[in-house]
């Protein structure tokens, strides 16, 4: 069966692949384990192999060096951290598993219920105790209590798909391994024909971005460029949230508005949306005034 690569995004790190299995019909009221819970006897190499990174640029404009000056400081590409994430990315694909994406762009799957503990953030929006906003959020319920959500998940986030029930899906966080129950309408299961062979790493501290592609036993650097990530500037601009996300949408050009208006501010080429209204894109062009 032909495998297809999809792009994951890491902040620091973005991704591009998932392995999933076709869900079996579920008997009403009875939980049915998906393929990720089936016991498989397999010998797995427990010693992580060395990650080999080589530069083979496909985009060579505005390329940065590994370390470069910026104003009165020095910035860098954090290759050791990138290797750690790539090791993780390879390791999660060694064993059979099903992966899913959390989705609720512009509340298209319904406004999430209020969590147990919430507050108004600096944008005057409802947020959970960790600062994740209700708007575009995905309700995360404890496995022992599906009446009121505990926290919100972020749109575009990658999760491990564990088990399907009538109205809920049990998933595990790729960061902590903690398990949650999520209403099915917020879950998009990734087909098992998908593999992670490309990754985008966004470094919000050093303000740079690197794209890599796996070929054989090597990861090839396809681009190394400066990046301007989001800033915390209420009431409009927001910082780029950390995490591992899957590219959900691509546009040849993305129209953006002047803050607080419906007036077109300009456009940005080659835009890829990874979480909420957050895009990776080319250099924006302002509309003529």
Q: What kind of feature is each model-predicted range?
A:
Residues 29-116, 150-188:
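SH3/SH3-like beta-barrel superfamily modules
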Residues 164, 183-289:
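Gly/Pro-biased beta-strand-loop elements
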Residues 133-145:
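Short, structured beta-strand/loop micro-motifs enriched in basic residues and often containing a Trp
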Residues 15-17:
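C-terminal motif of bacterial Sec signal peptides marking the signal peptidase cleavage site
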Residues 19-21:
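Bacterial signal peptide processing site
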Residues 147-152, 236-237:
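Short, surface-exposed secondary-structure edge patches
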Residues 5-10:
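Sec-dependent signal peptide hydrophobic core
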Residues 1-4, 122, 126-128:
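Positively charged n-region of N-terminal signal peptides that target proteins for export
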């Amino acid at each position: 069966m032909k495998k297809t690569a999809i792009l994951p995004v890491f902040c620091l790190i973005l991704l591009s692949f998932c392995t999933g299995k076709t869900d079996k019909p579920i008997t009403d009221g009875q939980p049915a384990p998906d393929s990720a819970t089936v016991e498989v006897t397999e010998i797995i190499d427990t010693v992580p192999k060395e990650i080999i990174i080589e530069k083979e640029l496909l985009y060579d404009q505005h390329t940065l060096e590994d370390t470069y000056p910026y104003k009165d400081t020095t910035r860098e590409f954090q290759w050791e951290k990138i290797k750690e994430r790539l090791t993780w990315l390879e390791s999660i694909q060694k064993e059979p598993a099903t992966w899913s994406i959390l989705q609720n762009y512009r509340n298209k799957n319904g406004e999430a219920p209020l969590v147990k503990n919430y507050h108004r953030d600096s944008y005057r929006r409802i947020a959970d105790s960790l600062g994740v906003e209700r708007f575009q959020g995905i309700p995360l319920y404890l496995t022992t209590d599906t009446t009121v959500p505990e926290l919100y998940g972020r749109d575009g986030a990658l999760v491990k798909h564990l088990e399907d029930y009538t109205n809920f899906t049990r998933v595990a966080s790729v960061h902590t391994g903690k398990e949650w129950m999520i209403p099915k309408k917020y879950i998009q299961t990734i087909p098992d024909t998908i593999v992670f062979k490309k990754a985008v790493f966004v470094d919000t501290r050093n303000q740079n971005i690197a794209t890599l592609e796996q070929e054989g036993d090597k990861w090839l650097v396809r681009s190394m460029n400066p990046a301007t990530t989001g800033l915390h500037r209420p009431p409009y601009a927001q910082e780029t949230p950390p995490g591992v996300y899957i590219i959900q949408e691509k546009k040849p050009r993305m129209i953006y508005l002047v803050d607080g208006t419906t007036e077109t501010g300009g456009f940005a080429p080659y835009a890829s949306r990874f979480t909420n209204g957050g895009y990776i894109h080319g250099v924006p062009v302002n509309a003529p005034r």
